[in-house]
């Protein structure tokens, strides 16, 4: 009898504990924001933002809110989506993180296709490459055998960090790019607005009165007309995750480039400043409200220290000198100094060594407005007809020293081998968190996909000389066809106290960094002007590092 009573008590106790845990779990789940976003602008408000006149207090406040308030969506979590089990040989259970500057999302359809139907994507693009070659168009050389594996690597990533993500912009068919991609991946997402794209051509308000030919003027008006009910004009960064999002913050940088005031300078004043002669500075005005930001997202990841992972998506200023980008990075670091859990920082840091990203005229126009066919024909003629003037000779000379700038971590030797980006990397390497931890700067051959070593090789793929370039662009000059840069970076804070300590902990440390150039360049027109990257972060310290396999 006594034993029976004790047994019943234990059963009741276990039931009570089970119910308590279930309730606690449900309560925790209820804490996740299901779908939240700041108020968006109407078309008339966007037009007001584009005018060079003081804003009303209400519009000023609305602009402040949308550039400091992240969108948060955990619908995937509530629909039952959970992280996929990834077990990497000799690493064990692992989190794979992907980063990609997706160039507005101009080729979102191709991204969605390779994520959902690899074979159909391969067949489609092989046919497109064949057709392009038959028409005499050049396509980039790729290793076809690597592409299926690169697709599978991206498919297995449970966290995606994105730059240049459009929302309601005509060039990307007014699509909510982050929402569509998150639906494809069955991921939760956070989105931070950097800019309101309020150039007169983006809003369809340009009347092109400078054109003498009325037929041509009407053609341009039609080309740049917009759907006033669909345009939202947002552009920013995003974090997508199969882990639920606990919280997110959006912090604008205090220093940078004023994309609104600077574009209001007249063409004559710009000519006096010789801005049009600087290769790498955009050749058409790009009027925007807002500025560069850092998006901080806290994910609930039970497998890591503190059961929390902080992910930071950022895009440092291209229209600024390297010292300004370093200052932006310093501000970002100050925001995470007191974070004790693991951190991943990723973004296009624009480490060109100058105040601009080199590009060709057609690519710049396509990136700005979309519609490849238009910009490869009359669009370029129109653009050059309204004052795009620059010196090809000077440009070629200026680019001669930077066409393969693929190791901005190298020493800065003024007069011999200048590298003005070195200061940014020194800042990150010297930085210490409040708990004494540091970012992982190691480059151990056994932890890389190709056996290469050197600074940051574990988290950013290196080649024989420098890093694998993440940005490749063609130019119009015969003697300088291609420029290659390492602009995109991943930094990881795990359990390491010294950035280069090879004997330190490898728990959640970066392994097997990859830059997927072949996949990105497989399509006749590259999917983006930047290639995607991945890094593997093991949930346990690998037991036998010396035998780590690729």
Predicted regions and their residues:
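Short coil/turn segments at beta-strand junctions that form active-site/ligand-binding loops
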Residues: 94, 156, 307-308, 340-342
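Bacterial N-terminal signal peptides
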Residues: 12-22
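Active-site environment of divalent metal-dependent phosphoester hydrolases
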Residues: 105-106, 167-170, 197-200, 258, ...
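Catalytic-adjacent loop/helix segments of enzymes that bind and process anionic phosphate/sulfate esters
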Residues: 224, 231-235, 242-327
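N-terminal, active-site-proximal structural segment of metallo-dependent hydrolase catalytic domains
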Residues: 3-6, 12, 27-234, 253, ...
């Amino acid at each position: 009898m006594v034993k029976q009573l004790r047994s019943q008590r234990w059963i009741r106790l276990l039931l009570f504990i089970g119910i308590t845990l279930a309730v606690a779990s449900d309560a925790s789940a209820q804490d996740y924001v299901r779908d939240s976003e700041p108020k968006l602008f109407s078309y008339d408000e966007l037009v007001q933002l584009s005018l060079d006149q003081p804003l009303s207090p209400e519009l000023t406040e609305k602009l402040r809110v949308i550039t400091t308030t992240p969108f948060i969506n955990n619908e995937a979590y509530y629909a039952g989506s959970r992280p996929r089990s990834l077990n990497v040989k000799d690493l064990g259970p692992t989190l794979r993180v992907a980063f990609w500057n997706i160039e507005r999302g101009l080729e979102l359809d191709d991204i969605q296709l390779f994520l959902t139907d690899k074979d159909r994507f391969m067949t489609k693009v092989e046919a497109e490459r064949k057709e392009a070659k038959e028409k005499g168009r050049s396509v980039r050389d790729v290793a076809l055998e690597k592409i299926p594996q690169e697709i599978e690597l991206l498919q297995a990533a449970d966290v995606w960090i994105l730059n240049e993500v459009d929302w309601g912009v005509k060039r990307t068919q007014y699509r909510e790019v982050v929402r569509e991609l998150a639906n494809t991946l069955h991921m939760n997402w956070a989105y931070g607005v950097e800019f309101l794209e309020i150039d007169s051509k983006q809003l369809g308000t340009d009347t092109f009165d400078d054109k003498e030919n009325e037929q041509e003027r009407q053609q341009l008006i039609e080309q740049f007309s917009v759907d006033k009910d669909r345009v939202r004009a947002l552009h920013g960064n995003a974090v997508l995750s199969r882990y639920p999002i606990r919280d997110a913050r959006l912090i604008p940088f205090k220093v940078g480039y004023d994309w609104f005031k600077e574009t209001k300078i007249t063409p004559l004043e710009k000519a006096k400043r010789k801005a049009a002669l600087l290769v790498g500075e955009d050749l058409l005005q790009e009027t925007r409200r807002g500025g560069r930001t850092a998006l901080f997202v806290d994910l609930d990841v039970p497998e890591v220290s503190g059961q929390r992972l902080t992910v930071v998506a950022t895009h440092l200023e291209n229209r600024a000198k390297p010292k300004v980008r370093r200052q932006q990075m310093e501000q970002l670091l100050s925001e995470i100094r007191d974070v004790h859990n693991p951190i991943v920082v990723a973004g296009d840091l624009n480490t060109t060594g100058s105040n601009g990203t080199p590009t060709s005229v057609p690519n710049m126009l396509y990136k700005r407005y979309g519609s490849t066919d238009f910009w490869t024909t009359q669009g370029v003629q129109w653009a050059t007809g309204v004052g795009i003037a620059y010196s090809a000779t000077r440009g070629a000379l200026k680019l001669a020293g930077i066409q393969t700038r693929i190791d901005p971590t190298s020493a800065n030797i003024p007069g011999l081998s200048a590298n003005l980006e070195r200061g940014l990397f020194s800042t990150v390497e010297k930085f210490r968190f409040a708990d004494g931890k540091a970012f992982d700067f190691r480059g151990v051959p056994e932890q890389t996909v190709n056996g290469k070593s050197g600074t940051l090789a574990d988290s950013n793929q290196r080649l024989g000389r420098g890093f694998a370039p993440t940005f490749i662009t063609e130019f119009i000059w015969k003697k300088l066809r291609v420029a290659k840069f390492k602009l995109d970076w991943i930094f990881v804070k795990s359990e390491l106290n010294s950035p280069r300590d090879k004997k330190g902990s490898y728990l959640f440390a970066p392994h097997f960094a990859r830059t997927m150039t072949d996949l990105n360049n497989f399509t006749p027109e590259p999917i983006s002007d930047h290639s995607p990257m991945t890094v593997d972060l093991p949930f346990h310290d690998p037991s036998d590092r010396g035998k780590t396999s690729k």
